Amino acid sequence: MNIKDIKKINFFISEKKNKNIHLIGIGGAGMMGIALILLKLGYKVSGSDLLESLMIKKLINLGATIYLQHSEKNIKNVDFIIKSSAISSNNKEILAAKKRNIPILLRAEMIEILMSFKKGIAVSGTHGKTTTTSMIADIFIDSGLDPTVINGGLIKSINSYAKLGSSSYFITEADESDASFLYLNPNIIIVTNIESDHIDHYDNSFKKLKQTFLTFLKKITLYGTAIVCIDNNAICDILTNLKCKIITYGFNKNADVRIFLYKQNNFIGHFYIILKNNKKLNIILNIPGKHNALNAAAAIALAIHEGINNDLMITSLKNFQGTCRRFEFLGFLSIDQGFDKRANCMLIDDYGHHPTELSETIKTIRISWPNKNLIMIFQPHRYTRTYNLYHDFVQTLSQVDVLLILHVYSANEKFIVGADSLSLFNDIKKLGKNYVTLISNHNMILDTLIQTLQGNDIILIQGAGNIDTIAHKILIKKTKKVIK
């Protein structure tokens, strides 16, 4: 889409009462935020998806018309369409829209239109985008700056994926999975890290992935700012090519915003931030893990850059409630083991689906609860990711005490030989790990769990597919209510 197209679209969507915007894949994490903002702005919003969810019900209550199927009938009175990156070009609604010459926008193109004439802040990176965006949103809201926010996960403090604000600030998560973040033109870009993921979209070239991040960063004008994690080698490789202002953060002693003396106690992270002027900030973070300290450091670097009061920022981080499905403590699950015995297990839900994310979650649990029996229920996400990172998955998954592995959530990808859960199961067993079970039927989960409980257990629900829905249905509904 070129500048003329954007001007044209901006022109006709300004007539809010007469135009209908249709979102295909409206239930996706990246799409719900856009739908919420459009509804708040007064547009007519419709959408389609295959599964109902609490967020879809919320959108309906706000006035959206949502169809739980894909059909060309859904776009009968539509003026233009926004499509999720997960939607195929062969989708019935996409094909019908092309026949009728209805404009079709990608998610990122719509965000760019919404962000026009605002001070755009984009949070990008392989890991940590959603949590970092949530922290930034909380800091700006608590500081009275009233930003507009679009996030890829539910921000607990506002119980939403998005918020329409009255100020000039527009904060958004920027998706690198299909390089669509290149449509954005923010004033400030945060890059949390660059690792091999979604590599099939980059011709299986990590070099091309890094180059795409560099292209994104080069979109910052001389008056803009890049805030980047100096601990990440791939980021350091591309920094010399930037001409804008650069602020670095990390554990590295050369960071502009440096993390120092990190400690962890249960769900609390404690560390100091050392600034270039040697000023020291005492940070207490309401979520554990060094990776979350890095996420907080990115938010701190931005807050300082924007002149936010340090005390307000520190208080906001201390009160940070977290993000849905990001190391989310659900409570204690009481499971009947028979013979009047019950096991009370800590239940943690986590969206991580990349070996690095899994490894960080495991490390975090081992630091705070070293003697707990760690049981992971894992659902691999995408055959391409499993194939490209197969060895890393085998090594990382072998680090837990008990592993229940579900079949791969394909996300509409075709099966790849050797990148399935049975292959993972067999190769983990070859390492001499006898605690791994392949879950071929979801009804096996509870019985398998009962056999592995030791009385000091942590159950970790891990993955990005529909594992949270499965686990909640199988575990929570068939056991005693979770007690926090």
From Swiss-Prot:
Signal peptide residues on this chain, from the entry's feature table: none
Keyword Cell division: yes
Subcellular localization(s) per the UniProt record: Cytoplasm
Catalysed reactions listed for this entry: UDP-N-acetyl-alpha-D-muramate + L-alanine + ATP = UDP-N-acetyl-alpha-D-muramoyl-L-alanine + ADP + phosphate + H(+)
Enzyme Commission number(s) from the entry: 6.3.2.8
Keywords recorded for this protein, A-Z: ATP-binding, Cell cycle, Cell division, Cell shape, Cell wall biogenesis/degradation, Cytoplasm, Ligase, Nucleotide-binding, Peptidoglycan synthesis
Molecular function per GO: ATP binding; UDP-N-acetylmuramate-L-alanine ligase activity
Pfam (any one): Mur_ligase
Amino acids binding ATP: G125, T126, H127, G128, K129, T130, T131
Catalytic class of the enzyme: ligase
Main location: cytoplasm
Function: Cell wall formation.
Entry protein name: UDP-N-acetylmuramate--L-alanine ligase
